[in-house]
Structures are given as C-alpha cells and as structure tokens.
Amino acid sequence: MGKRPIEDDAVASSELSRKKSKKEKSGKSKKSVIGEGADTNGHAPAAETTVDGSENEALSKAERKAAKKAKKEAKEASKAGKADAPTVENDEEAAKAARKAARKAEKKKLKEAEKTASSAPTEASSVPAQTLSSSNAGSYTEHTELAQLPQSEIDAFLTKNTMTIEDPKPAARKLRPIVNFKYLPVTDESQRAPFAGFTAPTPIQAATWPFLLSGRDMVGVAETGSGKTLAFGVPCVRAILSLPKDKRKGIKAVIVSPTRELAVQIYDQLVALAHPAGLSVVCVYGGVPKDPQVAACRKAHIVVATPGRLNDLIGDGSADLSNADYVVLDEADRMLDKGFEEPIRQIISQTPKKRQTLMFTATWPPSVRDLASTFMVSPVRITIGDNQSGELRANVRIKQLVEVLDPHAKEQRLLQLLKQYQSGKNKDDRILVFCLYKKEAMRIENFIRMKGFRVGGIHGDLSQEKRSASLAAFKEGQVPLLVATDVAARGLDIPAVKLVINVTFPLTAEDYVHRIGRTGRAGKEGLAITFFTEHDKGLSGSLINVLKAANQEVPEELLKFGTTVKKKEHGAYGAFYKDVDNTKAATKITFD
C-alpha cells in the first residue's frame, strides 16, 4: 500500500514528461508558423524568438506547478491510507489538471502572439492606411533607362522648369520625373496614342506621374494651360485597369470642376484616354436635362462633374461614389472662390476613406491649404515655376500691353486692333475678347459682327447648347473671334489663341490673370491687350504688381492712378467679412 502512491507518482511524472516533449514539438511547429506570418508582415526574427521563449517559459511553469500539486495530493492520500483505486483516480485527475493548465497557458500565449503579429504592421503604416497608396504600394516601377540617366540630367530638367517637389514622407530613393513618354509604364502601346502629337511630357506631367502611379495624394500648383488634365488622367485610367475585371463596375473615379465649360474640356480629353481601354466617361453639369446624365452614370467608370449637379445626383441616388477611390479637385482655388467649399465636402464625404486624392490649383492660399489638410494624407506638393509662395502670377510667356484710354473710345480702339491682328494671312487667327457684363458682351458681339467679322459669343444668358456650339466653333476655327464674359476666363484649353483683348477690366486682378491665361498655353507665347479707364483706377495697384511680377512694362499713365492695393473684400459683406470654418469643433470651456 505504501509503495503504490510512489509508483503512481512516477507514472504521472513520466506521462507529464511525455506530454511536455510533445508540447515542445508543437511549440516549435507553431513558432515556425508565427515566424512565417511575421516575415510576411515585415517583422524582425528577434520578435519571433521572444514570443517562442516566453511561451516555453510559461508552459514549463504551468507544468511544474501541476506536477507539484499532483505529487502533494498523492502524498496526502498515502498518509491518509486511502485505497489504491481512489489514489490512482486522484493521480489521474492531477495529471489531467496539469495537462489542462498547460493547454490553457499555451492558448493564451498563442493569442497574444497573434495579436502582436497583426497589430504591428498596422502601427507601422497607420498614415498610408487612409489612402490608396497602402493597397497600391509598389505598383509603379521606374523604367530601366530612366533609372540609368545621370543625376545631372534630372537636376538640369528640374532647374530648367523651375520645379519644386516637397514630399513629407522620407524615401530611400527619390522618384525621378518621367521626362520622356517612352518611360511611361503602359500595358499596351495603344495607350501612348494620345501623346502622338507631343514631343515630351509637360513639367507638371513629368513630375506628378511617378507619385500618382505610386498611389500618393498630391497637390499640384501650376499655371493654367500646363497640361494638368493628362497629368491626372493617365494615372486615373491605369488605376482602374489595374483592378480585376469583375471589380471595375461602378464609378471608380470622380473629377470635380468649377464650371461646365472646364468639365466638358476635361471630359473630351479623358474620353481619348479611357475609350480605347474600354472605360466609360460621363460629364454631368447643370443647365441641361438630368435624365440622360442619370442613365449615363449607371454605366460610367469615370465621372467629370460640377459640384452642384453632382450633389443633386448623389442626393436622389443616381450617383454612387462609395467605390470612387480616385478623387480629383481641379481648379480648387477657384471652386473655393465661387463658394463651393461645402458642396465639395459633401461630395468627398460620399467617397471611401481609403482613396487617392488629388488637388490642382493655380494659387496656394490658406483656404486651399486648409482644404488639403482636411481631405489628404501626407500629400506631395509639386510647384511649377518660381512662385513658391503660391501667390497668383501671370504667365511670363504672355506679353502684356495696358492702354489707358477714355471709356467712350473702347469700341473704335477694338476695331483698330481687330483690323491689325486679323487680316491678310492672319485672318483666321483666334482672338478672345473679354467683357465684364452679359449685356456688354452682347453689344460688343453685335458691333463686331456688323463690321463684317465672323464672331461668336459665350455668356451666362445663353443656353448651354448655344454656349457649347459657340465654343466648339471657336475651337475648330470656324469662328475665329469669340466674345466672352468671365465664365470662360479660366480652365478652358482653347488651342492657338493668339490674342486676348480685355475690353473692360475685370473686378479683381486674379480674374485678370485668368483671362490672359487663355493665351500662351502649352509652352507657347501669347499677347494680351487691356483697356484701362479711370473707372478701374481702384485696381491700378494690383495690376501694377502683376505686371512687375511678370517683368512687363508699366505705362506712365497707369502709374498716375497710384500703386495702392486695396484690401480684398467679400462680394456681399465687404471688408467686415471673416472666413470661418464652421466644421471645426468649438472650444470647450469648463467652469470650476
């Protein structure tokens, strides 16, 4: 009787040793599984050793504790003179308890190890997790020939085009501008067809493509006419084509534009890129029936839209942006000037949190910076030109002539200029004439037509159909003269506009810069002639600053009006207006 408990104790110890050996093998096997998972997620092997060591240590403690408890109970049973069967039963229960405790400890440690393995990569990439770059990382591979170019050539390209690239995320190797179309990664040579008429990418295209193809958020600050549409269009089409065919259904990209004319222009260029790839593009804007646009949205992959109409379609369920993970805000500064901030916020709220967001702007004021910080994650900022402050500047390739004259002499002087610049071999040269008000535009258009010139008009009183027809005729050269109000002053890419004439000075110097920006596009030179009268003298200081910044001659007659620059005022609230962001949380006040 006295020896039986000892033998049972030995049996129990032997069984525990056998189980321990089995669990150690299991632990090694699971260690390799954990190690493989850690390698997949980028963890160091040291972390694996720590997890395995702590696990074995915990298992050993649990087993020793259970064995000690079993031995103690066996001794107590022996002293009490219990029968063999109950003693064996108690020993078996003790061994069973030991095994259970060991399994419990093992499971606990495995769960902790799995939790550590899954949380570590999230912490390492917490910022990119809100952008498309997290899922698109590594999708762009630099062309071999581009990688082999001497750094001196890249530096010369950046210096020549006065390009500045600011990336808040440190990189082991900086992405090089795609300075030649052959370096652009395409899956099919037919995708290069839209570039057939160009010799090389524009500076904004060359600089932005590497970052956009890598899935990064980006802010592009560049003058109008710099080729921004293809800058965001090429990565847009490529991003959609990279998806499996069964996941391409629905709206995948949305481009927001401030005006109908600019939206149509973007649409035309994107169609040339998207249609050969089998992708559908739709353009939605107000002033036309909604039903055809609703039907088109159901089949569209890319939507180009003005803010108002797009929000209408979202509101009635006709446009679903829940899968639109490529978002472009074009002419962002102008959209804010036009009061579209809230509609923009509503549109972006309908898109996925995990998206790639792009913003193109001619200026970089605080309002645009605030908007970028709200919707973008670590955006790359690319500035073309020496205007690092982001203030509005005129294109230096445009020669600006300012004529100070009597208000009643405008029409006759306009007629002289038309005869001078549109006669003989230049009779088909495109000339854009700007007026301030709709009625003035109609009067000037009729005046020019009566003098025997072919002329069209574009202003707010015309229907969308007539505006589109006039613009198309002007672009195609059927009508070489176009009279417009500021509705056409920005964003329109009208090729080969030789001359811009400002019959009446606009309400702001910013509008003046955008007007004259219709010429001198795509690297070409242009000419702008502006009539300035005593009624405009309040803006003389601002105009003088624009002329000086572009190294243009300032007439003595203009200097007589003074160089004072008046404070920019709100159209409705004057100088008392204050821009307040209502979306920011109020300051919390606590009382003791």
UniProtKB/Swiss-Prot annotation:
Q: Write down the chemical reaction(s) this protein catalyses.
A: ATP + H2O = ADP + phosphate + H(+)
Keywords for this entry? ATP-binding, Helicase, Hydrolase, Nucleotide-binding, Nucleus, Ribosome biogenesis, RNA-binding, rRNA processing
Q: Name one GO biological process term.
A: endonucleolytic cleavage in ITS1 upstream of 5.8S rRNA from tricistronic rRNA transcript (SSU-rRNA, 5.8S rRNA, LSU-rRNA)
Compositional bias, Polar residues, is annotated for: 116-141
GO-annotated cellular components? nucleolus; preribosome, large subunit precursor
Known InterPro entries for this protein?
A: DEAD/DEAH_box_helicase_dom, Helicase_ATP-bd, Helicase_C-like, P-loop_NTPase, RNA-helicase_DEAD-box_CS
Residues forming the motif DEAD box are 330-333
- Return the motif ranges for Q motif: 179-206
Q: Does the keyword Nucleotide-binding apply?
A: yes
Q: Which PROSITE patterns match?
A: DEAD_ATP_HELICASE, HELICASE_ATP_BIND_1, HELICASE_CTER, Q_MOTIF
Disulfide bridge partners, by residue number: none
Where does the signal sequence lie? none
Q: Which GO terms describe its molecular function?
A: ATP binding; ATP hydrolysis activity; mRNA binding; RNA helicase activity
Q: Name one Pfam family in it.
A: DEAD
Basic and acidic residues bias locations: 73-82
Q: Which residues are listed as membrane-spanning? A: none
Q: Looking at the record, which segments are called Disordered?
A: 1-146
All copies of the Helicase ATP-binding domain together span 209-382
The Swiss-Prot or TrEMBL note on domains reads: The Q motif is unique to and characteristic of the DEAD box family of RNA helicases and controls ATP binding and hydrolysis.
Q: Which family does it belong to?
A: Belongs to the DEAD box helicase family. DDX5/DBP2 subfamily.
Task: Give the function comment from the record.
Answer: ATP-dependent RNA helicase required for 60S ribosomal subunit synthesis. Involved in efficient pre-rRNA processing, predominantly at site A3, which is necessary for the normal formation of 25S and 5.8S rRNAs.
According to UniProt, the name of this protein is ATP-dependent RNA helicase DBP3
UniProt organism field: Phaeosphaeria nodorum (strain SN15 / ATCC MYA-4574 / FGSC 10173)
